[in-house]
Structure formats: structure tokens, C-alpha cells
């Protein structure tokens, strides 16, 4: 019984180490999304931090900035969605598909 427990603890420690490495890797990885035919491009990290926004000057309409605002929001959400999907796929590889307790992602 103690051998099983020791083996299980070792596996948990290995999984935790791999998860920490993944979190660092994701923090350094950039995800890009463009909308409006490239009018707006947003770059975020795997942790969701925005690294950059590129706006085609032709997309700027001083009389109606709401379209530009919507495109920025959409591009940001798309880039974050890509980052979240990548993180979920990598976490599934690490955990073997086991659900994680809340707060361990």
C-alpha cells in the first residue's frame, strides 16, 4: 500500500512540474487573431496578456468608431480563445484527460 502511495505521489509531483513548465511556455507563446480582412490584428500571450494591436488606417472612421471597437473586441476574444484551446489541449496531454480540481489549471 505504501509503495502505491509513494508511486502516486511521485506521479503527482511529475504532473505538477510539467504543468508549471507548460504555464511558463504558454506565457511566452503568442497567439494572433485578425478580423475584418486584416483590418484589426491582436496578439495575446497564452496567459491572455495583450502584446499588441495592429489597425489598418483604412479601418478608422472618425464618424463611427463603434465598428473599430467591435473589431478590436472580436479579435481579442478570438486570440484568447485560441490560447485557451491550446492550453486545454496541452493540459489534457499532461493529465491524461483527468479533470483537475478547481484552481489547478
Predicted regions and their residues:
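A short acidic/small-residue loop/turn micro-motif
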Residues: 57-60
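Long amphipathic alpha-helical segments used for membrane anchoring, targeting, substrate engagement
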Residues: 1-32, 82-105
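Residue-level signature of catalytic and energy-coupling elements of molecular machines
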Residues: 12, 48, 72
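Stable alpha-helical structural segments in soluble proteins, enriched in small hydrophobic residues
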Residues: 71, 75-86
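Alpha-helix boundary/capping detector
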Residues: 38-41, 52, 74, 98, ...
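N-terminal intrinsically disordered, cationic/polar leader segments
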Residues: 28, 34-38, 42-54
Amino acid at each position: 500500500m505504501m509503495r502505491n502511495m509513494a508511486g502516486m505521489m511521485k506521479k503527482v509531483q511529475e504532473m505538477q512540474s510539467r504543468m508549471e513548465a507548460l504555464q511558463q511556455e504558454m506565457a511566452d507563446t503568442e497567439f494572433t487573431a485578425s478580423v475584418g480582412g486584416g483590418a484589426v490584428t491582436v496578439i495575446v500571450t497564452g496567459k491572455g496578456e495583450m502584446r499588441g494591436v495592429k489597425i489598418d488606417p483604412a479601418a478608422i472612421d472618425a464618424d463611427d468608431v463603434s465598428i473599430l471597437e467591435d473589431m478590436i473586441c472580436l479579435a481579442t476574444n478570438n486570440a484568447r480563445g485560441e490560447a485557451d484551446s491550446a492550453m486545454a489541449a496541452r493540459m489534457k496531454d499532461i493529465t491524461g484527460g483527468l479533470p483537475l480540481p478547481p484552481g489547478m489549471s
